[in-house]
Amino acid sequence: MKLRKPYKKIPRAERMRIIEMACKQVSRGVFFSTVIIITSFLPVFLLTGQEGKLFHPLAFTKTFILVVDAILVVTLAPVLISFFMRGRFRPESANPVNRFLEKVYEPVIRACVKWRKTTIGIMLIALAASVPMVMSLGREFMPPLDEGSILFMPVTLPDVSNSEVKRILQVQDKILASEPEVKSVLGKAGRANTATDNSPISMIETIVMLKPRSEWRKGVTKDSIINELNSKLQIPGVTNGWTQPIINRINMLSTGIRTDVGVKVYGQNLDSIYEFSQVIKRDLEGIPGVKDLYVEPITGGKYIDVNINREEIARYNLSIDDVNAVIETALGGARITTTVEGRQRFSVNARFGQDYRNNLPALKNLQVQTQGFGPVPLDALAGIKITEGPPMINSENALLRGTVLFNVRGRDLGGTVQEAQQKLNASIGKMPKGFFIDWSGEYENLIRGEKTLKLIMPFVLVIIFIAMYFAFDSAREALLSLISLPFALIGGAFIIYFWGVNLSVAVAVGFIALFGLAVETNIVMIIYLNDAMQQLVAKKGNSRETITKDDLREYTINGAAKRLRPKIMTVSVSLFALVPILWSSGVGSDVMKPIVLPMVGGVITSAIYVLLVTPLIFLMNKEYELKKFGKIEVTEVKP
């Protein structure tokens, strides 16, 4: 018996005809799968706030790249194929990779077709098992981004003196710098030299720059560094707070809260607001995940109260303005001259020194000059005493406001706040008339992001269904492709559960990107299954008298098993591009991994579904058509 040559040279005319036919067969599906990936990612543009600013560049980049890709698929790719695919060709069966894949895959798909209920049951069980996994995951707005630094924000009592704050700052900086992983420390107390910083002198901000991780002690993490420093920095009268410089500034600008979560207490009376704030603080203590708990001071500020005695000043022929002018000059200062340095002018002010301004006996002995009676001590003209009052009055929407602040560490943000809300509702119950509380900080962003995603997800599914309908000109096959999406979620749910990742906007963006990838693989499979049905109809006609169930089964298996390499290649390209990100490190990898994880897991499970279940569902659909309509619906591949 004479063996057939493994290589065959095809004439140019026939080669161009084959290339044209192959491009018509595949390009439509590839084009629409690319369009589906583009359109499924468009709802990311609906994200607002921080999440929008973070993911819009990603959406723009991906959209522009895929738009160019979709154009090249139907224009440049066929031309390049005609140039490079020439000479002698090997049949598909001569490729050892194809033979190996078909040898492994064909018995498996035959078993799946034979044991239909078992195959579908296993997939449904896996889908059902993923639901409680997703429900048990924690919730957070965005994955914590490691900035490579720490912002230490302790607060002390409102009436603290400048000298005491300076001493505390020096002690804290010395302790912080003693940590082996700390590179440098820079701290400040009070506000910066700008009109937009309203920080009181009791607020300290210290930026702690860390060394590269390669220089850290073995087994040390950033959380362990914070815990170790926090235990060393327990100073009486000082409440510690730990965050990061960039996220702290973002939170303060967007929500007005310098911690992860803030409970805003609104009311009409500062004393009542402070009492409610203390009750809330006591209820929040002990909740797992609540750290750096602190009530923003509403009382405790020290004021010098000067009550002028009108009868006494009248006896000395003085007016209230005369006495106020002396007090203002002594405490606030008065301009005595102006100095000129080059092109700049500076006013020179004079007032009492710090020690005298804070010294009540010295203020009482302040001499007020009179006409005809000589200097008179201020104590003889007014009652002087130190009283307490609010160090700062905060208002929002025309209501007085107090705030209970805390950070979340060692637990997800959503679960921590949810438990805190339940505890407060049970403890406080209904607030008195004129008082109410509101949750703010990063939790506010979490709620906004979840509301937006609840609108986006159904929108994504509708867009994908419409795009697939135009790809196949069949609502039934579009729905058949859409069924693959829940099974793609299985892998995403499993991998984020075992990786220990919380649900966030980044994870949701990863699932949105996964939808397009899963549908792309499914479209490639359905193209070849429809091609097998066309061959069956061309050979035996389209009637129940000429087509049997065995014919449908064999041609479906043949369509699924043949040309297995491009189907595997579609999945492999995605995995080869995504998997290296899981082992990436450095700034930014903390945000990228939650995006990539659901895509990696989903691509794997969707590939299993497409290879094993899609042919089975396709076969069952064709058997139903043959039984009910007497023929099968064949989707022709259009140019």
Task: Name each model-derived stretch.
Residues 1, 64, 72, 463-563, ...:
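Hydrophobic transmembrane alpha-helices and their membrane-interface caps
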Residues 1, 27-46, 54-93, 206, ...:
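Transmembrane alpha-helices and their membrane-interface boundaries in multi-pass membrane transporters
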Residues 2-21, 50, 56, 75-127, ...:
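Interfacial helix-loop-helix hairpins and adjacent transmembrane helices
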Residues 12, 241-243, 274-460, 469-472, ...:
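Extracytoplasmic/periplasmic membrane-proximal domains and adjacent transmembrane bundles
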Residues 19-26, 93-143, 183, 232-236, ...:
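Signature of alpha-helical transmembrane segments and their immediate interfacial
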Residues 45-62, 140-143, 431, 472, ...:
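Short helix-loop junctions at transmembrane helix boundaries
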Residues 45-54, 124-160, 215-217, 246, ...:
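Transmembrane helices with small-residue packing motifs
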Residues 163-257, 282, 311-333, 340:
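Solvent-exposed, membrane-proximal periplasmic/extracellular interface segments of envelope transport
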